């Protein structure tokens, strides 16, 4: 627990004698003067006692008021500073735990209305050394071995405005569309959580503690070329060392802490030095921390899948409603579609099989071949294809999930899955419990061996079935996108809100029945 530095209280109260000092003896020879002297002295004693009593009571009251006032003020915890070297250069960073000042991000302060809206809990954001977030962003030119990431990480992580989509989407929504990179959830979550109405500056009142470390961006620059395992692990080791020195981590052993890791979980699960990725999740200290990832390990309780960022970032509720109306009324002339690229050199490549299957479907399927264009962060061709199709095929990507799942659903197209781990076992906080209410599942093995035709399966759905499923997909849109407004939407809960609510719910449940020690 962070020690509160109470002001020095007085070591002792000011003490006054209850009786006056001894005086000269009374002259007994003059009884009148003697009686008069005694009377004066009695009055003096009574007055002195009264004044002393009021003085003591006043001091006690003042001390009580001062104690109660100062007790409510969070004071920074201080401990022995540690110095961490920057991966880019030898930089000395003094590590101290400080409470973020309200002026730094102007979080909503406590009020009766906000108290009512924060029944689920409050979140405290660690003020970490900048080497864990800001410095990483400042090195955006070096985060990718092939090109600069600066444009992709600009604009609070939303990227450049997608003005070229003006011929595809309603003009009044163009300002809500961006060329958003799929690996920027760390930036988006950090900016939003600093402005969250339930953020607290008092760690004693926190239900959850957020670690604003950009783990995915930090490791991304070391995933390729000839970097050693130590390079890929460096940032995460520094982070866990810092966090484990925080008193609130030590109080719970990390079970009420959470972090956003903006890549798939497998980028942080290296078992051997020669394997891919970092070993961040396996570093001591990470075991009990809840991790928000765009792809989770379905067998790890502490991994939570959150939606990939899409290009749509609504500014208000009206943006959401207008987009829902647009995709609901869109004329769809194609039964199904597929956007992707085959993987050369992979035996029985399923994506290549789907491309061939589409080509053989005689106008029922539309494709976007991503071998000849950039598809990872969306394009007008992909958006138009999804907007014009009833169903969109969603095989696994390089891992079990793809950003395309969310691009597809955002366009009001019904996803068709071939792996249950692509969505059903990934995004339980965001998708309905009944998968068939919004999606179709087809056994990939039956497609591969030719016993099942995708076209025939999808043609069995009536127009009314398709309408109901599409309506369910459209209803989900607010929960799958990240709002542009730093304070979120007015009444809709976006993906960030759903994630934070889930974290609060999980921590309250864990506190009752489940702690790893």
From Swiss-Prot:
Disordered: region residues: 1-31
GO CC annotation: Golgi apparatus; Golgi membrane
Glycosylation site list: 250, 288, 377, 449
Principal localisation: Golgi
Transmembrane segments: 50-70
GO process terms (BP): protein glycosylation; xyloglucan biosynthetic process
PANTHER family documented for this protein: EXOSTOSIN HEPARAN SULFATE GLYCOSYLTRANSFERASE -RELATED, XYLOGLUCAN GALACTOSYLTRANSFERASE XLT2
Name of the protein described by the UniProt record: Xyloglucan galactosyltransferase XLT2
Organism in which the protein naturally occurs: Arabidopsis thaliana
Organism taxonomic ancestry: Eukaryota, Viridiplantae, Streptophyta, Embryophyta, Tracheophyta
